[in-house]
Amino acid sequence: MHRKGGHKGNLLPLLLVFLVGLAIFLYPTLNSYFTGKRMGSSIEFFFGTAPTGTAPDDLLPTEPIAETEPPTPYPEVLELLEQYNRDIYEDGQVRLNSLAATEQAGVLFCVSGQQGDMFGVISIPGIELEMPLYLGATEAHMAEGAAQLGQTSIPIGGENTNAVIAGHRGYNGAPYFRYVPELQIGDSVNITNLWGTPHYRVVETKIIQPNDIDAIKIQPGRDLITLLTCHPYASGGKQRFLVICERMEEENGR
């Protein structure tokens, strides 16, 4: 005589094995989905709260007035960032000499009304990438998006600047900077911050060793951003892949 429930008892371990296997199989996809949603929410919040330079309708004058340039938002913050960029250029980036230096933001960035310490948004149409951008390449910032290396220029544009922006070559199932090495000469890279959107074009790519600091330093007279990620893919970071981008001439105003 067969005992009741015997077949069910035999199926339970198989069901558990199936569910565990399914969870493992779906983990990268689900993680990528939720990472993308989190980044998307941060970007949406940034664009929804960034100053536009225009006043609400109820504050606009009833009589027409002559057109004027909109006021610069947070002028004291902008001046602080510009001064930092001048300082590191003039001292030759002497403190760009360790991992700890790249993790430390040169300027504590926190603006009322903005989400945490998010600085802006990096957009690369050629690889359909849009990510939050932070100052200081800490582990937390790198998990949340792309991050400017401390002791390199802050990405607001200007002569004698080179903002080095790092991103994981894939992280927790999401691509991050995985496809950055596929960029071609002439591809566009845009950095949106509270003061505008400087536009850049890819002018050079190269592979360097992790300790090649000179390759990421400011180049006198130029307005650059340099994208940096590990290379080869899934190698544990044996080398670094650089994508060097220069400000488009019509945009090079600051």
Predicted segments with their positions:
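Terminal targeting segments of Actinobacterial cell-envelope proteins
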Residues: 1-5
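Solvent-exposed, non-transmembrane regions of membrane-associated and secreted proteins
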Residues: 6-196, 200-254
